[in-house]
Amino acid sequence: MNKYKNIKRRKSNRIYVGNVPIGDGAPISVQSMTNTQTTNIEETIKQIIKLKKVGVDIVRISVPTLEAAESFKIIKLNVDVPLIADIHFDYRLAIKSIKYGADCLRINPGNIGNKRRILDIVNCAKDKNIPIRIGVNAGSLENDLLKKYKSPIPEALVESAIRHIEYLDSLNFNQFKVSVKTSDVFSAIEANEILAKKTVQPIHIGITESGALRNGIVKSSIGITSLLLSGIGDTLRISLAADPVEEVKVGYDILKTLGIRFRGVNFIACPTCSRQEFNVIDVVNQLEKNLEDLSTPMNVSIIGCIVNGIGEAKVSTLGIVGGSKTSALYKDGIRQKNKLKNQEIIKELEIKIRKKAKSLDKLKKII
């Protein structure tokens, strides 16, 4: 797999969310957020388990009430993924969440309250040695900044962030990351570019409230890719009005495409035409679903005919080239003697992919 060699990541400090390193050259972590009712403990745990299956590094959970904080405590005891408590308005819920085992807090400068409340949160975070995210959002900017700038322009978002960065610095607290988010792609890019020049703390990136699945993927891909290519971003979330599992998949797909971080199978598949000898779309979609749990990076080409099939197969870990009734199989660029029956491609190729993953994992351990 080729790596985009011209990406030079911005230098930043290192913090840890649970056992996940963030900043200072650490792998860019992929986050998501539960969309269940936090008080529905069983469903929230189930969703976190699903997120872990597709490789989530960190999960954020909304804690809007004391009952939700009590639920957070139980959830934390039943999952092994680092959890961020998402806090708005009531600083006491932040303190409760820290005491109940949160690995990190997200606080919103626009609604968390005065410096005294933030001081209490920071003192508690220091005591438990956990980080905080200063999460600035265009939809909840401080009133004085809205009055000054008339609207949540990039400069307003950054001023909010810097205001709180300076306060945390004055408290000798450096275990924090920062985010400046807006639903407008270009405003988000500009705000992060300005912020990156003004702080050495890790930056969390994302396009907030980006929309439903298709539109949200497009917006997030454009915004996040632009920032990553500039070396900005130490952790990310794809915000979608969709199943949170999709957020994680898209996050990894972006990192994979840029050659920054690899997880699981990278499928190369043709868009299909009348030349296809088997149903490429069905095969790819089913294999993607079946292999969600696989973390071993590899390229698998699934091409419906010989036009581009052979060329793609020769540069793939495994490759299928469509033929009449049976299709050619390539392994590490070499055509194999045995062919796969077109009606059994999904089953047989999944077996071969999993077998190859085991051999690659074993080789990696030996090396």
UniProtKB/Swiss-Prot annotation:
EC identifiers of the protein: 1.17.7.3
Chain residues that bind [4Fe-4S] cluster: 270, 273, 305, 312
Transmembrane segment boundaries: none
Catalytic reaction equation(s): (2E)-4-hydroxy-3-methylbut-2-enyl diphosphate + oxidized [flavodoxin] + H2O + 2 H(+) = 2-C-methyl-D-erythritol 2,4-cyclic diphosphate + reduced [flavodoxin]
Cofactor note: Binds 1 [4Fe-4S] cluster.
Keywords on record: 4Fe-4S, Iron, Iron-sulfur, Isoprene biosynthesis, Metal-binding, Oxidoreductase
Cofactor(s) listed in the protein's UniProt record: [4Fe-4S] cluster
EC top class named in words: oxidoreductase
GO BP of this protein: isopentenyl diphosphate biosynthetic process, methylerythritol 4-phosphate pathway; terpenoid biosynthetic process
Matches recorded under Pfam families: GcpE
Gene3D superfamilies: Dihydropteroate synthase-like (3.20.20.20), Sulfite Reductase Hemoprotein, domain 1 (3.30.413.10)
Pathway: Isoprenoid biosynthesis; isopentenyl diphosphate biosynthesis via DXP pathway; isopentenyl diphosphate from 1-deoxy-D-xylulose 5-phosphate: step 5/6
UniProt cross-references to InterPro entries, sorted A to Z: Dihydropteroate_synth-like_sf, IspG_bac, IspG_bac-typ, NO2/SO3_Rdtase_4Fe4S_sf
Gene Ontology molecular function terms on file: 4 iron, 4 sulfur cluster binding; 4-hydroxy-3-methylbut-2-en-1-yl diphosphate synthase activity (ferredoxin); 4-hydroxy-3-methylbut-2-enyl-diphosphate synthase activity (flavodoxin); iron ion binding
NCBIfam families with a match to the protein in the record: ispG_gcpE, PRK00366.1
Family: Belongs to the IspG family.
PANTHER family for this protein: 4-HYDROXY-3-METHYLBUT-2-EN-1-YL DIPHOSPHATE SYNTHASE, 4-HYDROXY-3-METHYLBUT-2-EN-1-YL DIPHOSPHATE SYNTHASE (FERREDOXIN), CHLOROPLASTIC
Protein role: Converts 2C-methyl-D-erythritol 2,4-cyclodiphosphate (ME-2,4cPP) into 1-hydroxy-2-methyl-2-(E)-butenyl 4-diphosphate.
HAMAP family: IspG
Name used for this protein in its record: 4-hydroxy-3-methylbut-2-en-1-yl diphosphate synthase (flavodoxin)
Organism: Buchnera aphidicola subsp. Schizaphis graminum (strain Sg)
Upper taxonomic lineage: Bacteria, Pseudomonadati, Pseudomonadota, Gammaproteobacteria, Enterobacterales
